[in-house]
């Protein structure tokens, strides 16, 4: 009987300890999520509130218009522009604000709810550029990693509401399986188009060369192609997220929250104070 009581007490104690450990781990992970989201606040402030962000967006689209006007295509080819959507033509910063206020990491289901809410804003200059191209012997194609299966209708509705023209379903190349975009670019070219401009907020919007690569490779790509920026590649500012975040460390997006925080801090280049 005593042995049974001891075993029961030991089991109860073990369950209590394990429950306590689980609770501690949940609290620790919750704190880490809060820390990760709070690190995004200043960048979000910049994108939502600064004149500098708006100026850079207008600057990018002004350059895009000049580049489009000067671009020539081979005989028999049609002129095309491929554009990313999120943080390129569509401003989703209110979703990022919701993440900050609720200490929420990115979640695909939450993102789809945001798309369904149809509350995206237009990036400054995007509507005007889009409509200019579509009315001057060009065609804008939207190559985005929004999901083809669940996020197409919300996206099209939002863009119509915001004043984008040319947003018929055939202009959209959403994600079906792979995030890398080169295969979708090739599909557009097979229709007799020549892509004269790539517009995006992420180097991965310009092809697969540095897709999934570390930032050293991404910086090298920029240096090697410096003459194309403002002419063939139009880059929009995005301080909130992108391929550069995954480029901070090998396997960054497979790390837990604490690991991602450490990778961010490890990447900081700092003065030693001397």
UniProtKB/Swiss-Prot annotation:
Keyword annotations for this protein, in alphabetical order, are: Cell outer membrane, Lipoprotein, Membrane, Palmitate, Signal
User: Does the record bear Oxidoreductase in its keywords?
Assistant: no
Q: Which Gene Ontology terms of cellular component type are present?
A: cell outer membrane
Instruction: Tell me one Pfam family matched here.
Output: Acid_phosphat_B
Q: How does it sit in the membrane?
A: Lipid-anchor
Please, where does S-diacylglycerol cysteine lipid attachment map on the chain? 21
Q: Cite the positions of N-palmitoyl cysteine lipidation.
A: 21
Range of residues in the leader sequence: 1-20
Is Membrane there in the keyword field?
A: yes
Cell compartment(s), UniProt: Cell outer membrane
- Write down the superkingdom of origin: Bacteria
Identify the InterPro entries for this entry. Acid_phosphat_B-like (IPR005519), HAD-like_sf (IPR036412), HAD_sf (IPR023214), Lipo_e_P4 (IPR006423)
Name the record gives this protein: Lipoprotein E
Gene expressing this chain: hel
């Amino acid at each position: 009987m005593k042995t049974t009581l001891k075993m029961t007490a030991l089991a109860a104690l073990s369950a209590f300890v394990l429950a306590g450990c689980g609770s501690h781990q949940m609290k620790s992970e919750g704190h880490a999520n809060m820390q990760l989201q709070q690190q995004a606040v200043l960048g979000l402030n910049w994108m939502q509130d600064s004149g500098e962000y708006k100026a850079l967006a207008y600057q990018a689209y002004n350059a895009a218009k000049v580049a489009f006007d000067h671009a020539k295509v081979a005989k028999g080819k049609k002129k095309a522009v491929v554009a990313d959507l999120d943080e390129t033509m569509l401003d989703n910063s209110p979703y990022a604000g919701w993440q900050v206020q609720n200490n929420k990491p990115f979640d695909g289901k939450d993102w789809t709810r945001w798309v369904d809410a149809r509350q995206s804003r237009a990036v400054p200059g995007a509507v005007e550029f889009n409509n200019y191209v579509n009315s001057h012997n060009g065609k804008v194609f939207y190559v985005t990693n929004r999901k083809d299966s669940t996020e197409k209708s919300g996206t099209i509705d939002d863009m119509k509401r915001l004043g984008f023209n040319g947003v018929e379903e055939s202009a959209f190349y959403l994600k079906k399986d792979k995030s890398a975009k080169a295969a979708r670019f090739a599909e557009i070219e097979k229709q007799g188009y020549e892509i004269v401009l790539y517009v995006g907020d992420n180097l991965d919007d310009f092809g697969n060369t540095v897709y999934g690569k570390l930032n050293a490779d991404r910086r090298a790509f920029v240096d090697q192609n410096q003459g194309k920026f403002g002419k063939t590649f139009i880059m929009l500012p995005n301080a909130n997220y992108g391929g550069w975040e995954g480029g901070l460390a090998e396997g960054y997006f497979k790390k837990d929250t604490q690991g991602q925080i450490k990778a961010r801090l490890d990447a900081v280049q700092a003065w030693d104070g001397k």
